[in-house]
Every structure is written in structure tokens, then in C-alpha cells.
From Swiss-Prot:
Chief location category: membrane
The organism's place on the tree of life at top rank: Bacteria
Membrane topology summary: Multi-pass membrane protein
Keywords: Cell membrane, Membrane, Transmembrane, Transmembrane helix
Organism classification: Bacteria, Bacillati, Mycoplasmatota, Mycoplasmoidales, Mycoplasmoidaceae
Bilayer-spanning residue ranges: 29-49, 117-137, 155-175, 225-245, 254-274, 287-307, 329-349, 376-396, 432-452, 458-478, 491-511, 523-543
Cellular compartment(s): Cell membrane
Name used for this protein in its record: Uncharacterized protein MG447 homolog MYCGA2290
Length: 582
């Protein structure tokens, strides 16, 4: 009887593996690639839309208006009592700033500025959802390509347990450092603005204390938003894991339906919680977590159905079975996932540096403006640019499953084709989205969704938006390098490619453009830092990846890399087990 049961299990697994292989081995490689990329773009788009909708709802509904007449967030929100017991109201600041001919800030500026400084941390949160899941999906695809049943079980068990532990630990770390990070971003060197004010005069003193009040409230609101997302993002790591692993098994339809539905629920709860509670920005974060939770529940139910149908390798009983957790696969999963994490984390840090010094350079070049003027502008621009950037990254997520499977089959010819197909698709897609967001929907977004008021502010916002969006095209063109290196387990090269934009090219570009902007008294040279950085990154990544894409075998045999070393070690340690069974 046990023999029959084992034979049935083996037969069902063989049928499942054959079914998965057929999904990947269609001769029309470009069509297969599109089949994987399009759902990934949609999922990445809707994942970014979570944050985008939150930020729109924050801008439109948090502040008091006809849409939310009962809100506590109006210009009187700035009123406070100082340490000496003196009461100050917003009208005092308005009078002082008008007398000093300094454009005053208002409640909308505060909300946008809070969004702006929280953006780098939300990017890190997105990065952490990929830290384990991307390496797990890579190894899972490779195991499926080889048809190695034992490795499939070991990768699944190791990745699941690691994802739980790492996501909880990193969540605690982010919550611990968030307040310090946000305070630094809000401050910049904003105190330098006081140098141009006579703080001994009444008007100068009033403006200075309201600048401090603005920063205090900016950090307070951004913190409440970030704490909730950072504290509960473990749920989203499971969503990412289920999506990538189901995609690795060749499924597309159901996993592409869940994110849009969750987003609709997110919008509903955004409205209800922001409109009918006084939680402000925090309400939007709660709505996002509700959307995450419902998505996770849907994925789990779907996976249970697949398990009962014997249509998936993602069986929960295999997770804690003795011998399935493999420390060597743990190292590979983390090392491969670190490339995606490094990319997003480095971009987050570089964006934080950019945002912090934006205050400084505004003070130096345009001292007649509030120090947080351009930071507030980016509070409207950043959600739009992030929406485009995140959807562009869906290209690499989709193609990586196919590329990893081909690597498991040692099909290097198809890997080279994928390397060239991806930038072709990426350029077409990113160019269309650039024109749509930069010249088609720009005013609709800026005026109707982000409350940009005044013709001058609209002109500045449009210019900043179009400059910022340029980077998306070149990021899309350069992503094939990281795709190639991660999928073929060239971990060292993957790290270099992923750190190119956030570190290697950013440092020289930042210092050059920062000083050039000050020397020429042109703040837009500073704003061009991100696009120029993306262009140089594209050039650098193509230089290091093109030779590798066409001479894979030679590079594997002649070039040392930690990924290939670990892979060879795994194969050596596994062979004795196979012989023992024989």
C-alpha cells in the first residue's frame, strides 16, 4: 500500500512538472516573455497604486475642504503654545511672512512635505518585500527548470521560514530608526534659513518659530504613516512571495486579479477611514494594511485549493519537515535577494540625501522661497514618478521567472534572447508612460489630485515632474543587467549592477550637480541629478553585462563569483546523498 501511495505521488508530481515545463518551453519565446511580463507590470502598477492612492486621499481628504468639512487639519492646525505659555496662531505667521515678503506655507504644503520625506522609507519597505522573496523565486524557478523534486522542497521550506523571520526582524529595525530618519530629512540644514532673518525682530522671530512648528508637524504626521506600514509590512512580503512563486510555476490569471481587487478595497477604506476618523495620514496606512491582509488571505485560500488539486509544489506540510531546511540554500536566497534590496535601499538612501539637501539648496539659491518649497513640490511629483517607476520594475519581475527557468535548463541561447527582448519592451512601455504622465495626465494629477494651486506653482510642478520622469526610461533600459546576473546566479555582478544607480554613479553626479547648481544659481541643475544618474547607470550596466550575455560559459568557467561557488558546493554535497540512496 505505501508503495502504491508513493507511486501515485511520484506520478502526480511528474504530471505537474510536465505541465509547468510546457508553459515555459513554447518556441515563441517573445510571446512567452510577454505572457509573464504583462501580469507583472499590472501587479507592480497596482502595488505602487496602493501608495499612490493613499497619498492622493491624504492630499484630498485629510485637509479641511468641501470634501471633508469636519477635518481637524486646516491652517489652525499650526496654532500652538510655546514653552513660555505664549499662544501663537497661524494668522500671526501669515502677517509676519507677508511683511517680510516670504511666501507663506499652508496646511496643504505640510501634508505634501510629510509625504515627501516618508517616500524614501516606503521605498525601503518595498525593497524589503523583495529581500527574501526574489532570491526564493530565483532558486525555485531554477529547481523547476532542472526538475529536481528534492531541491524544490528544500527551497520552498527554507525560503518560507526565512521570509517570516527576516521580515519581522527588519520591520522592528525600521520602526526603531524611522523617527530619526524623518527628522533628518525634514530638517536638512533648514536652520540656515534663519541666517537671512533677523530673529530679534518680531516678524523674524515669528517666522522662525513657525518654521520649527512646520518641521515638528511634518515629522509627526510622516511618522504615524510610516510606523504602521513598517510595522505590518510582513503581510506584504507574503503577498510578494505567493505571487512570485505562483508565477514561477507558470500561473498568471488568478494572481493578476488579486492586486486590482485589493486596490479597490484599499480605496474604499481610504475614504472611510480618512473621511470619518481624525487619524489623518495614519488612516491611509491602516487602509493599505487592510488591503494587504485581504490579498494575503486570497493567496492562501488559492494555494490551499491548488494543494488539494495536487497542482502546486507549495505544500505547507513540506515546510517544517525534517531535512528540508537547507542552510546552503538560505545563503543563496539571501545573497541573490540582496541585489534587489541593495538596489532599492541604495535608491532610498540617495533619494533621502537628495530630499534633505533640496532644503539646503533652496535656501542658497532662492532664499525668498520657504525652505521646504521644492520639497513640497516633490510631495506631489514623487507619487506620480513612483507610480511609473514601480510599474517599470514589473518588467524585470516577470522576465526573471522565465530567465531563471531557462537557467535551470542550461538554455543559454534563450537567456541571451531574453536579455535583448527586455530593454526593447521596456523602452516601448516606459516611453508611452512618460508621455502619458508627463504631458497627458499631468495637470489632472497635479491640480485635481494634489491640489497644486497658482499658475506659477503649476509650471514649476510640471517642469519638475517631466525632469524626474526621464529617469524611468533609462532605468527601464538598464534593468536587463540585473535580470541577467540575478537569474544566472552571478551574485557579485548582480550586486554591482544593483548598486550602480544608488551608489557608484550617484556620488559623483550628486557632488558635481550640487556645486554646479550653486555656482550658476540654477536649482534645476540640482533637480536633474536623478535623470543624469539614471543615464550613467544605464551606460554602466550595459558595459558590464553585454559581454556576459553573449559569452556566459566562458565567464562562468573563468571568472570567480560567490554564486557559482555556492552552486558548485551544493552540487557536491548533494551527490553523496544521491549515491547513498542508490
Amino acid at each position: 500500500m505505501p508503495l502504491n501511495t508513493n507511486n501515485e505521488k511520484l506520478t502526480s508530481k511528474n504530471v505537474l512538472n510536465d505541465r509547468i515545463t510546457k508553459r515555459f518551453n513554447d518556441r515563441r519565446l517573445f510571446i512567452v516573455l510577454l505572457r509573464f511580463i504583462i501580469p507583472s507590470i499590472l501587479v507592480s502598477f497596482f502595488a505602487a497604486l496602493y501608495i499612490f492612492v493613499d497619498q492622493i486621499m491624504i492630499v484630498k481628504f485629510v485637509t479641511r475642504s468641501d470634501l471633508n468639512p469636519d477635518s481637524i487639519f486646516d491652517n489652525d492646525y499650526f496654532n500652538f503654545v510655546d514653552s513660555n505659555g505664549q499662544s501663537w496662531i497661524y494668522q500671526d505667521y501669515l502677517t509676519a511672512s507677508n511683511n517680510l515678503k516670504i511666501p507663506p506655507f499652508n496646511i496643504n504644503d505640510l501634508i505634501r512635505a510629510a509625504i515627501s520625506i516618508s517616500a524614501p522609507i516606503t521605498v525601503i519597505i518595498n525593497a524589503l518585500t523583495l529581500l527574501i522573496t526574489m532570491g526564493l523565486a530565483n532558486q525555485f524557478s531554477k529547481a523547476l527548470g532542472r526538475g529536481d523534486e528534492e531541491k524544490i522542497k528544500e527551497v520552498w521550506a527554507t525560503g518560507f521560514i526565512t521570509n517570516v523571520i527576516v521580515s519581522i526582524a527588519t520591520s522592528m529595525i525600521i520602526v526603531g530608526v524611522a523617527k530619526t530618519w524623518l527628522t533628518s530629512s525634514a530638517n536638512g540644514t533648514m536652520n540656515r534659513s534663519l541666517e537671512s532673518l533677523d530673529t530679534n525682530s518680531r516678524y523674524g522671530y515669528i517666522v522662525s518659530i513657525f518654521f520649527s512648528r512646520f518641521r515638528e508637524l511634518q515629522v509627526q504626521n510622516a511618522s504615524s504613516y510610516v510606523y504602521i506600514l513598517a510595522g505590518l509590512f510582513t503581510i506584504q512580503t507574503f503577498n510578494q512571495m505567493y505571487f512570485l512563486l505562483n508565477q514561477s510555476e507558470g500561473r498568471q490569471l488568478f494572481i493578476s486579479i488579486i492586486p486590482p481587487l485589493a486596490n479597490l478595497i484599499n480605496i474604499l477604506f481610504d475614504y472611510l477611514l480618512i473621511r470619518y476618523t481624525s487619524a489623518g495620514i495614519a488612516a491611509a496606512a491602516y487602509a493599505t494594511v487592510i488591503g494587504w491582509s485581504l490579498s494575503c488571505l486570497a493567496y492562501v485560500i488559492y494555494n490551499i485549493v491548488l494543494i488539494k488539486k495536487k497542482a502546486t509544489h507549495l505544500e505547507y506540510r513540506e515546510i517544517f519537515r525534517k531535512g528540508h531546511f537547507n542552510w546552503n540554500y538560505l545563503y543563496l536566497i539571501i545573497l541573490i535577494g540582496l541585489a534587489s534590496f541593495f538596489r532599492n535601499a541604495a535608491l532610498s538612501v540617495s533619494n533621502g540625501i537628495f530630499q534633505t539637501n533640496l532644503v539646503t539648496i533652496t535656501e542658497k539659491i532662492q532664499p525668498n522661497l520657504p525652505p521646504n518649497y521644492y520639497q513640497s513640490i516633490f510631495g506631489s511629483v514623487t507619487p506620480i514618478s513612483n507610480l511609473m517607476l514601480q510599474s517599470v520594475w514589473g518588467l524585470i519581475h516577470g522576465s526573471r521567472s522565465l530567465c531563471g527557468f531557462k537557467f535551470g535548463q542550461r538554455n543559454f541561447k534563450d537567456i541571451t534572447k531574453i536579455y535583448w527582448y527586455v530593454p526593447l519592451i521596456a523602452f516601448s512601455y516606459s516611453s508611452i508612460v512618460y508621455l502619458l504622465f508627463g504631458f497627458g495626465l499631468n495637470n489632472i494629477f497635479l491640480i485635481n489630485l494634489f491640489n497644486i494651486q497658482g499658475a506659477d506653482n503649476l509650471v514649476v510642478s510640471n517642469l519638475v515632474l517631466r525632469i524626474t520622469l526621464v529617469q524611468s526610461i533609462f532605468i527601464a533600459l538598464s534593468m536587463n543587467a540585473q535580470l541577467l546576473f540575478q537569474s544566472t546566479q552571478r551574485i557579485g555582478m548582480a550586486w554591482i549592477a544593483s548598486l550602480m544607480q544608488g551608489l557608484f554613479t550617484f556620488a559623483p553626479v550628486f557632488f558635481t550637480m550640487y556645486n554646479l547648481a550653486i555656482d550658476t544659481n540654477n536649482i534645476y541643475l540640482y533637480i536633474w541629478i536623478q535623470p543624469i544618474n539614471a543615464i550613467l547607470t544605464c551606460i554602466g550596466n550595459w558595459i558590464i553585462s553585454i559581454p556576459f550575455a553573449h559569452k556566459y560559459r566562458e565567464f562562468v568557467s573563468k571568472r570567480f563569483d560567490i554564486g557559482t561557488m555556492l552552486d558548485k558546493y551544493l552540487n557536491k554535497t548533494k551527490n553523496p546523498k544521491v549515491k547513498a540512496k542508490q
